[in-house]
């Protein structure tokens, strides 16, 4: 069966690295679950986003996956230590991208390919908002309003 391409993505297939279905704790890990949690919390307090924390833990500490060691996902670990993100990181990055495209379109209103790109990004935003409202990560009354969220562009 041939891989089905995702809607509004340039990548056509499913090639790429695949994480193991049942990750086990690698033998070379010398950190306890408590130490991994403390490292993650320290990085979050220094201003790192969850994806950046994962990259730092992987590249500098040799920790491939927080969940395999602690038994909890990284965001759950941070929430337990009082660090909560009001907007999930993937949604926040899409909103920032949409705001950058809007700023570009103010200067270049006839750039139709950017206008189409904005439509694609905003449709992803709306789909994610619907999902996060359904699972309870966003409040039910959350509304995507580019003018109100313009402070997130930085």
Curated annotation (Swiss-Prot):
Keywords (A to Z) from UniProt: Ribonucleoprotein, Ribosomal protein
GO molecular function, one term: structural constituent of ribosome
GO biological process: translation
Pfam families according to UniProt: Ribosomal_S13_N (PF08069), Ribosomal_S15 (PF00312)
Family matches, as SUPFAM superfamilies: S15/NS1 RNA-binding domain
Compositional bias annotation for Basic residues: 1-14
GO CC annotation: cytosolic small ribosomal subunit
Residue numbers spanned by region Disordered: 1-24
Assembly and binders: Part of the 30S ribosomal subunit.
Family per similarity comment: Belongs to the universal ribosomal protein uS15 family.
The protein's name: Small ribosomal subunit protein uS15
Protein source organism: Pyrobaculum arsenaticum (strain DSM 13514 / JCM 11321 / PZ6)
Record gene name: rps15
């Amino acid at each position: 069966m041939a891989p089905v391409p995702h809607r509004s993505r340039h990548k056509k297939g499913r090639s790429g690295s695949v994480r193991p279905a049942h990750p086990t704790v690698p033998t070379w890990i010398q950190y306890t679950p408590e130490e991994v949690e403390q490292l993650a919390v320290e990085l979050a307090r220094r201003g790192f986003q969850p994806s950046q924390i994962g990259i730092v833990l992987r590249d500098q500490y040799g920790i491939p996956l927080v969940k395999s060691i602690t038994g909890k996902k990284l965001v759950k670990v941070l929430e337990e230590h009082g660090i909560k993100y009001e907007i999930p990181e993937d949604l926040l990055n899409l909103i920032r991208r949409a705001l950058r495209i809007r700023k570009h379109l103010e200067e270049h209103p006839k750039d139709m390919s950017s206008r189409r790109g904005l439509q694609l990004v905003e449709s992803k935003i709306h789909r994610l908002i619907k999902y996060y409202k359904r699972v309870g990560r966003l409040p039910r009354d959350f509304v995507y309003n580019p003018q109100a969220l313009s402070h997130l562009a930085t």
